[in-house]
């Protein structure tokens, strides 16, 4: 599986994950394969179905 072809993220997993920076909610962007934290302005990648919740691995959102 590549970063651009993501399997659906389990809704149960999404319900327990929070942004590691703000502890706020995340939004799943299936097309981009990312979990978005609007509060932190960061997009966390999902690689091979595994969310990478490290702030150093996140990309800043365009303002």
UniProtKB/Swiss-Prot annotation:
Q: Tell me which InterPro entries the record gives.
A: Trm112-like (IPR005651)
User: Which Gene3D superfamilies does the record cross-reference, listed alphabetically?
Assistant: 2.20.25.10
Identify one Pfam family in the record.
Answer: Trm112p
GO CC, sorted alphabetically, is: cytosol
The UniProt similarity line reads: Belongs to the UPF0434 family.
Protein name per its UniProtKB record: UPF0434 protein GDI0182/Gdia_2252
Q: To which species is this protein native?
A: Gluconacetobacter diazotrophicus (strain ATCC 49037 / DSM 5601 / CCUG 37298 / CIP 103539 / LMG 7603 / PAl5)
In the record, what lineage is assigned to the organism producing the protein? Bacteria, Pseudomonadati, Pseudomonadota, Alphaproteobacteria, Acetobacterales
């Amino acid at each position: 599986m590549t970063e651009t072809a993501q399997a659906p993220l389990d809704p149960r997993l999404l319900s327990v994950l929070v942004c590691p920076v703000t502890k706020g909610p995340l939004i799943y962007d299936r097309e981009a394969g990312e979990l978005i934290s609007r509060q932190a302005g960061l997009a966390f990648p999902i690689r091979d179905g595994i969310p990478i919740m490290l702030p150093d691995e996140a990309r800043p959102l365009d303002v």
